[in-house]
Amino acid sequence: MDLHQKLPWHPDTRSNHEGKIQGLQLRRDDVSKRKFRWVSSAGRQDGSKAECWTHLVGPPQETVIITEGPMKADVIYALTGQSVLAVPGVNSLNHLKAALQYLKENGTKQIMTAFDMDYLSNPHVTNGYRELSGILASLGLPYGTYLWNPEHKGLDDYVWEYCYHQGS
């Protein structure tokens, strides 16, 4: 499936709910330390610092999924039509509260979390999930957690595999 045909925008765009570009990430050739780096122009005239923005794919719906990684969100949305809010990483929740408040004000009634399945065993992911739970509770947003076969690390992998087998 060609994602460019399915999506009304280019999947590398990191935009807010108004469609304005918030940030730019580059994928590193050497991913042994970090896969992605935020681009910053803070030292230049009219430059901006790199921030860990959220990425909303699709319109606010009654139920919205939260996952880690904007590309995962793009894939999940393209394959399911379910709106997804992505954080750059499980411990990068700086702008999450504002994004969740926007969703709540625009009809979202429930959040389903979908962090990678290693949240069950990775203490960094577990801590991020705990912080996310606190933010959701503080906003009064009911939430649940999607679980799937851990052989598929992310929900995007699981949905892709499911769609692949449906088509064969």
Residue positions per predicted region:
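Phosphate-handling DNA/RNA-contact segment within nucleic-acid enzymes
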Residues: 1-107
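TOPRIM fold recognition
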Residues: 61-64, 71-168
